[in-house]
Each structure stands twice: as C-alpha cells, then as structure tokens.
Design a protein with these regions (language model features):
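Positively charged, low-complexity terminal tracts
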Residues: 1-94
Length: 94
C-alpha cells in the first residue's frame, strides 16, 4: 500500500462514505487468515462499532507501514503527538 494514490486508479466514494466515521477506540482481533479492525465510537457506558475493516495479514503490514510513514511526516510538520493513556479494560482494545 503506497501512501500516495496510484495515478492510474480511479476511486469512487458514495456520499454516505464521504462523510466519514468518528472513532475514539479501536478493537483488533484476528484469525490465522485475517485481521478484523473494529472502529468504535465510545460514549460510556456504551460503544458502537462505526466501521469494521477485515484485511489479510500481508495487507495489514502495508497499512501499518503507510500509517507509520504518514505519522512521521505529520510529527515533522506539527510536532510530536502526546500519546493518550490506554483505556482500562481487558487488553483487547487498542
């Protein structure tokens, strides 16, 4: 996965997806064949999954590389991001 969109790729997005989804929590689970990323909007005492991404382990590694590169560029431009404390829980939420 490249950080820059492929110039030959035409990507369409419908109006509903264009709005985006808010998430302040991420739950990650996996099987041998896939990773499941549940993006959650947590408003205690309830959390609502706003988006679920299912992807292969190989593609997830490319996503992580692209995120790390973009995070590094962001911090070079705007300064180091202070990490938020981990939420209390059983460790399944990241």
């Amino acid at each position: 996965m490249d950080e820059a969109p492929n110039q030959g790729l035409n990507v369409k997005i419908d109006d509903e997806e264009l709005k985006g989804r808010y998430s302040n929590l991420l739950r990650i689970t996996h099987t041998r064949e896939e990773f499941i990323l549940d993006f959650i909007n947590l408003v205690p005492p309830q959390g609502i999954v706003t988006s679920r991404i299912v992807t292969s382990p190989g593609h997830l590694k490319r996503i992580i590389r692209a995120l790390a590169a973009n995070l590094e560029r962001y911090e070079q431009l705007f300064g180091v991001i202070q990490e938020a404390p981990d939420p209390a829980g059983d460790g399944s939420v990241h």
